[in-house]
Amino acid sequence: MATSQTKELPRPQLFTVMTRYIPGLVLTGVITGLALNVGDMPWFINMGLGALTLAILFGIIVGNTLYPWLQPVCSDGVVYAKQYLLRLGIILYGFRLTFQQVADVGATGMVIDLLTLSSTFILACWLGKRVFGLDQQTVMLIGAGSSICGAAAIMATEPVLKADASKVAVAVATVVIFGTLAIFVYPWLYQLNLHYQWLPFSQETFGIFAGSTIHEVAQVVAAGHAIGPDAENAAVITKMIRVMMLAPFLLLLSAYLGRSRIKTSGEKREKSAITIPWFAVIFILMAGFNSLNLLPAVWVNHLITLDTILLAMAMAALGLTTHIGSIRQAGVKPLLLALLLFIWLLVGGTGINLFVQHIALV
């Protein structure tokens, strides 16, 4: 006699995806919504604390309180946000830039940015390894955040380095501390120099100095606004050129790490040895596309808003997976490294700005 067996039908793939990823994405979305709303408050705007910084801060708070109970349900979505939404956010970051902005500042601004970026990152690597004995991941993350564009640069460098979440959080913390300090120090230095006339800085050239040396875009805007409109415009454009240098920086870093691994392991060179961060390449392409002005300004603004949301979700995910104990274990050395880099950006950045501007006038 034939017996009939009832087999359980497989769940639809869409349902499986939803149950795996949606809870974590919702959690990061809620944290992002809170960060966006709080970041729009005047006090936080004046402090230069944008949505990205607040998202990782709120993420760390939730990650070290409620998340251990939510992790079994939310972990897949959180990891997805930290990896894939981050890359998409970096790609869409290109819509904040145009090649016309580069032309507005000219060769002088580009050379200042290039010299400041390269000298700061090289100094970070030397000090971090030789003086403080820090690991390569921490050193390069702090170097990227200090020399390029703060938290966004750290997050973009993370997949190239395959860095631990705790090290990323430490690097972001240094950017927040000294970038926030810059918001108050730079306007004070401008007024001091305006009174004593120590250095030949106009409001515009001081804006270029601020844009080439302050960590975060939001911090540049806050400091420039406190100085004056000419300084703010020059600072933001100069900062955007630094942001544009993120993509070639990631490509060079990836090539360097690939060659270092070959040299260390003694293996033969293979095509797969050097990993190309394609999201960085597409980032440049998006900036080029945006330079053509093919999309209406309203669409571009929507894409920028979407980009902020995606990056904030990635930062929230990073915060959720960061343990405060791991940050404590990092000790004071990363903070001291970031402090020395901040001093270099102030002193060395002043020298670079004055030197390049002097050469341009000759």
Curated annotation (Swiss-Prot):
InterPro entries: UPF0324_pro, UPF0324_YeiH-like
Protein's recorded name: UPF0324 membrane protein YPO1307/y2878/YP_1285
Membrane topology recorded in Swiss-Prot or TrEMBL: Multi-pass membrane protein
Family: Belongs to the UPF0324 family.
Source domain of life: Bacteria
Cell compartments where the protein resides: Cell membrane
Classification via NCBIfam families: YeiH family putative sulfate export transporter
Primary subcellular site in the record, as a coarse category: membrane
Transmembrane region(s): 21-38, 48-70, 102-124, 139-161, 168-190, 240-257, 278-300, 305-327, 334-356
Gene Ontology cellular-component annotations: plasma membrane
Species assigned in the record: Yersinia pestis
Keywords attached to this entry: Cell membrane, Membrane, Transmembrane, Transmembrane helix
Pfam families, per the entry: Cons_hypoth698 (PF03601)
